[in-house]
Regions:
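Short flexible loop/turn segments that cap and initiate beta-strands
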Residues: 229-234, 275-280, 649-651, 657-659, ...
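Accessory beta-strand-rich segments of carbohydrate-active enzymes
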Residues: 37, 44-47, 89-200, 224-225, ...
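Edge beta-strands of extracellular beta-sandwich domains
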Residues: 294-299, 707-719, 812-821
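Extended acidic/polar, glycine-enriched regions
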Residues: 149-151, 220-307
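Non-catalytic, glycine-rich low-complexity segments
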Residues: 32-49, 64-101, 112-116, 157-229, ...
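Beta-strand-rich structural segments
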Residues: 217-221, 652-656, 732, 738-754, ...
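Active-site-adjacent substrate/metal-binding segments within catalytic domains
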Residues: 72-100, 104-113, 117-125, 130-131, ...
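Substrate-binding/catalytic cleft of secreted carbohydrate-active enzymes
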Residues: 218, 346-349, 356-614, 618, ...
Length: 822
């Protein structure tokens, strides 16, 4: 975590005294005070004729309409998953007015951006004071000189232009399987700093003899006015409990570039690891005639070792990397993910048992890395050179700049163990020529720059076989059971790639699942899928049509199938002593422009959480293998109606890390079973039981050596078979205030529920009502496929009521009158 430490009491616009502390992450962002500028902004989506239009107010009658917004804010909070319209890519404007009260003599005033998409320009009044290209690295604009030209008694007018228009000469490519979002979707801050101040400190630690470690500190100044009087630098090191273990103080002259300013030893070092993420603090204070201030940087002491054709070691002990992936994307806000949601998401990762995350496919917000440090989650962070090929000089410079900024800004995070050079760079399409030699040469340039900036960490890429010898670590395409082959081929694919790749890691496995869709026979399609023909994603295998038989095209996209696939993958991973690790794709469903035909349109549904953070059943499969805290989960909490013949044995699975689980079916014990992690399915915790027509009650009791753990589910069992869907029903199932949840069901001519129906339905509303849609979830899209013959959506119902509807292109539209409860 990069954080300004010195707290200065500053009076801002409010009539209150508030303490401000700065997270430093930008290119030149250094200060002693920081005010986060989340409120007081207005937004306009579109272009203007000139900067004067931003400020002219009542001097014209045809002004554009401005909307009040709170930062972070994304252009595409709702339209990124609109089933009918592709998401907006173009210009947008933000404006605000800021009171300036810099407390430092000849101090500097900056605007700090944690990230803005994708190209940005900053204006103070009519003056363009700075520009930035790139949507993910942090950057700053020094507005000191511009302030002097504005009335000092008036609030400072600030406008920010953001543009996420398509541009093949920038990264990431629009061929990427995620949106290139626009807007001020990370925090913006007002920063004050003295005339000369610390711009950055980099901390290197190495484990020495015994339990000692050696720490080196390098520092860089922000000194735009070439201040040359003597300065004083003091450094204090504290352990994770706040105890001071080292102090120093030295007077010196200002320096240029980066300089080593301190070397010292830590005796009896406490090592950073997933089980004990101990963080030290380095507090650096710089004093000058202009004032004093400093930085507080956290760091960890740990060692990394990648064994050739073998496992990964952390602190000289083998650690199987149990990983996932994370996109900055959330229902209703897109890239403007609130801090509390980020915290909850990373906490949910840790509770699942994750010890590794690949941050796909770009530099992420400071809070994400801070949480990885605190929770003990190792990380792979990469630049967004993703698909499309290789552009010209400006394209290459942007790649180099983004890599330089990422490593410079996130250097001190002990969680980061890999720097990613790119992703799927074998994917052509943005340029007339796809030159593999040029891509190889540029990949080598990035690899060299990464090692020059940070010799302590390895480099890595995923899926570009013609470049696999360039980075230190390589991750090939292995999608056993989804894009290629069957999941039972997974271990053989791993073993082959471990043999063929000196330093191997497996990033991306899994598949899509439509939340709430379950199946009694999820593998009935497997007879079509050939074995022995490879497990890689080839060509356009991500599309739902064309090519050879595969689960992504011929499967049912049920949670049931994905549970089987994940269960098998995890069983195999745990048995391989030479495996470095693997990371499933992905933790949460996310928006993508490439998949309009998915069950939830424009959503990549490979997450173990829905886009709003709701867990799917597969979350608990991972937890049963990885979590240390005792857990027990009967599969089927979101499966309200199962089906089959009378007296037909049905499979019940419990996912648990308890040593023994006993299952009760309608009050009668079906027996206790011991957990065996090498057994499949569910580590041996599975039973074939007979269910009765109507309501069934399952209860499982897990034994842990302490208090027992209990899980229960209630569901219906239907023995009647059904024909094709004939009609839809629509009913209100719950109400909270003025928000009504409605549920559609498909029935055949005889009135029997069609429990495997997967037709596309469309919800609508007229009158004084509003669909709570464009969320990209199984209950938050107006267009989606049925899951087990049903679908839900919420409707906000106003005074006078509304008329809800559900339709299918082959079935008659059904209506439901809704009344406001007030």
């Amino acid at each position: 975590m990069s954080r300004f430490f010195i707290v200065t009491w500053v009076r801002f616009r409010l009539n209150a005294i508030i303490p401000i502390a700065l997270f430093i992450s930008g290119t030149i962002c250094v200060a002693q005070t920081r005010q986060t500028l989340d409120s007081g902004w207005e937004f306009y989506q579109g272009s203007v004729g000139s900067i004067w239009e931003i400020w002219r107010g009542d001097k014209a009658t045809d002004n554009v309409t401005w909307t009040p917004v709170i930062l972070p804010h994304c252009f595409n909070g709702r339209d990124s998953v609109d089933p009918d319209v592709r998401y907006y890519q173009g210009p947008g404007w933000y404006r605000t007015k800021i009171s300036i009260k810099n407390p430092y003599t000849e101090g500097r005033t900056l605007l700090h951006f944690d990230g803005a998409g994708q190209k940005s320009r900053v204006f103070v009044g009519m003056k363009n004071v700075g520009e930035h290209n790139g949507g993910y690295d942090q950057w700053d604009v020094d507005i000191t000189d511009a302030i002097s030209k504005v009335d000092s008694q008036a609030a400072l007018p600030v406008a920010v232009f953001c543009d996420n228009s398509r541009d093949s000469e920038s990264i990431p490519s629009d061929l990427s399987d995620f949106n290139r979002y626009g807007g001020l979707y990370r925090h913006v801050s007002l920063v004050y700093c003295p005339q000369v101040s610390l711009q950055r400190i980099h901390i290197e630690s190495a484990i020495g003899e015994g339990s000692n470690s050696i720490v080196k500190i390098r520092a860089r100044l922000y000194n735009p006015t070439s201040y040359r009087d003597d300065i004083e630098l003091s450094i204090k090191i504290q352990d994770g409990y706040g105890k001071t273990i080292h102090e120093s103080n030295q007077k010196m002259s200002p320096w240029d570039d980066e300089k080593e300013v301190e070397v010292f030893n830590i005796t009896d070092s406490k090592l950073w690891s997933p089980t004990s993420p101990h963080l030290y603090s380095c507090i650096a204070i710089l004093k000058s005639k202009s004032g004093e201030g400093g930085l507080k940087e956290r760091f960890g002491v740990r060692s990394l070792e990648w064994i050739e054709h073998g496992p990964f070691k952390l602190n000289a002990e083998r650690l199987l990397l149990r990983g996932t992936h994370y996109h900055e994307d959330h229902a209703g806000v897109a890239a403007a993910v609130p801090d509390e949601v980020v915290r909850q998401t990373l906490k949910s990762m840790k509770e699942m048992g994750v010890n590794f995350v690949r941050l796909g496919h770009y530099q992420q917000a400071p809070l994400v890395l801070d949480l990885c440090d605190e929770l003990g989650i190792l990380a792979w962070e990469e630049i967004p050179w993703c698909r499309g090929g290789l552009g010209g000089d400006s394209y290459k410079q942007l790649c180099r700049d983004m890599q330089r900024n990422m490593i410079d800004q996130h250097f001190n995070h002990p969680s980061i163990i890999l720097w990613g050079l790119g992703n799927e760079n074998d994917w052509p399409g943005d340029f007339e020529t796809f030159d593999k030699t040029a891509i190889r040469n540029f990949m080598g340039i990035l690899n060299t720059q990464a090692h020059q900036l940070d010799p302590s960490r390895k480099t890595v890429i995923r899926r570009c076989d013609f470049c696999k010898d360039i980075p230190d670590i390589y991750s090939p395409s292995i999608w056993a059971g989804w894009y290629g082959g069957r999941y039972i081929e997974y271990k053989a694919a791993l073993e082959k790639n471990i043999r063929d790749t000196p330093f191997f890691f497996h990033a991306e496995y899994g598949g899509d699942s439509h939340a709430r869709r379950h199946s009694e026979d999820p593998e009935k399609f497997l007879g079509k899928v050939a074995t022995g023909e490879g497990t890689a994603e080839v060509g356009k295998a991500y599309k739902a049509d064309g090519g050879k038989a595969r689960a992504s095209k011929d499967g049912d996209w049920s949670e049931s199938y994905m549970i089987n696939l994940f269960d098998w993958h995890l069983k195999e991973q745990e048995s391989m002593t030479n495996l470095t690790g693997a990371a499933m794709w992905i933790f949460k469903d996310f928006a993508t422009p490439l998949r309009p035909e998915n069950p939830v349109p424009r959503v990549n549904q490979k997450g173990v959480l829905e886009r709003d953070g709701t867990p799917k059943e597969s979350y608990y499969v991972f937890q049963s293998y990885w979590a240390e805290k005792p857990m027990l989960h009967i599969y089927g909490h979101t499966w309200p109606v199962r089906w089959g013949k009378s007296d037909e044995p049905k499979l019940v699975k419990c996912f648990s890390n308890c040593r023994e689980v006993e299952l009760f079916v309608n009050g009668v014990s079906a027996g206790a079973k011991l957990r065996d992690i090498a057994a499949y399915p569910a580590s041996g915790l599975n039973w074939m039981v007979k269910l009765k027509e109507g309501t069934n009650f399952l209860r499982a009791i897990g034994k842990t050596g302490g208090a027992p753990i209990i899980d229960e589910i209630v569901f219906q069992y239907q023995t009647a078979s059904w024909d094709k869907p004939d009609h839809l029903t629509l009913n209100e199932i719950s109400r909270e205030g003025d928000v009504v949840t409605v549920e559609a069901h498909a029935f055949d001519k005889a009135g029997t529920a069609c429990l495997d129906a997967s037709e596309v339905v469309r919800f609508g509303v007229t009158g004084n009502g509003r669909l709570l849609d464009n969320l990209g979830t199984s209950t938050g899209s107006r267009v989606l496929q049925l899951y087990n013959g049903c679908a839900r959506i919420r409707i906000q119902c106003g005074h006078g009521g509304a008329m809800a509807s559900v339709s299918n292109e082959k079935l008659e539209t059904t209506f439901l009158k809704l009344q406001n409860s007030k």
